[in-house]
Amino acid sequence: MAARQVSLGSITFANDAPFVLIGGVNVLESQQFALDAAAVYADVCRRLSIPLVFKASFDKANRSSIHSFRGPGLSDGLAMLQAVKDTHGIPVITDVHTPEQAAPAAEVCDIIQLPAFLARQTDLVQAMAGTGAVINIKKPQFLSPSQMANVVEKFRECGNEQLLICERGSNFGYDNLVVDMLGFGVMKRCCDDLPLIFDVTHALQCRDPGGAASGGRRSQVLDLARAGMAVGLAGLFLEAHPDPSQARCDGPSALPLHQLEPFLSQLKAVDDLVKSLPALTIQ
């Protein structure tokens, strides 16, 4: 089966093409914060010849605590993302949480993302599909890889074939996630070899059972990312922060921004090697 392609301007997502980085920050902490982070990503990806889509959220709507920082909201957040596009000339992606957010987000963003916790919400799927935008579908932690076929089918029935599928880990008992490397191949087969993205950042989450925020295993991000790239991916989803200890959300899982270039250099080497090998099917 030939790998399906999804095009975004000059960028091509495909499981047999050089990987695309969906990289950025967890949440829009301020306009300058977003511009500065995007500048680092753009410079590093330009030097390494890695296609880039910049990611940031305008609203973290599923925080554990009502007191946690959520972001600037839809209107101000989309204005910030537009400024990133205008300043750095790079495409952007954000996540939407209600059907009403889909159309305005798609007017600014090149890709809109369906959050993992909401992947079975049919009204939201219909609204997102109706924009005609490229959609990044996060696999819920509670779904098996093969069940992603049902989410993909909803989008197709709603007339949208511009789909990316994204692995972000699976529940492993209480308060922990694991990444099943066998699941990558299952998702590819069940979803007709749609471009597969690996969200290495959120796969590193683990919770304090009594806490109100997610913990993480940032020190293991390179191990997990290299393992995922070895499977043959269309893209990597990554969040970084200039000072993870001060991040407003998910700092324990964020890559320190100053380590972005050596981190991506290693992943590019793995990706280049894997995709230089001849195809081999084992029955």
Curated annotation (Swiss-Prot):
It comes from the Bacteria. It is an enzyme of class 2 (transferase). Keywords: Cytoplasm, Lipopolysaccharide biosynthesis, Transferase. Pathway: Carbohydrate biosynthesis; 3-deoxy-D-manno-octulosonate biosynthesis; 3-deoxy-D-manno-octulosonate from D-ribulose 5-phosphate: step 2/3; Bacterial outer membrane biogenesis; lipopolysaccharide biosynthesis. Pfam families: DAHP_synth_1. Disulfide bonds: none annotated. SUPFAM superfamilies: Aldolase. The keyword Glycoprotein does not apply. It catalyses: D-arabinose 5-phosphate + phosphoenolpyruvate + H2O = 3-deoxy-alpha-D-manno-2-octulosonate-8-phosphate + phosphate. GO terms for molecular function: 3-deoxy-8-phosphooctulonate synthase activity. NCBIfam families: KDO8P_synth, PRK05198.1, PRK12457.1. Belongs to the KdsA family. This is 2-dehydro-3-deoxyphosphooctonate aldolase. It comes from Synechococcus sp. (strain WH7803).
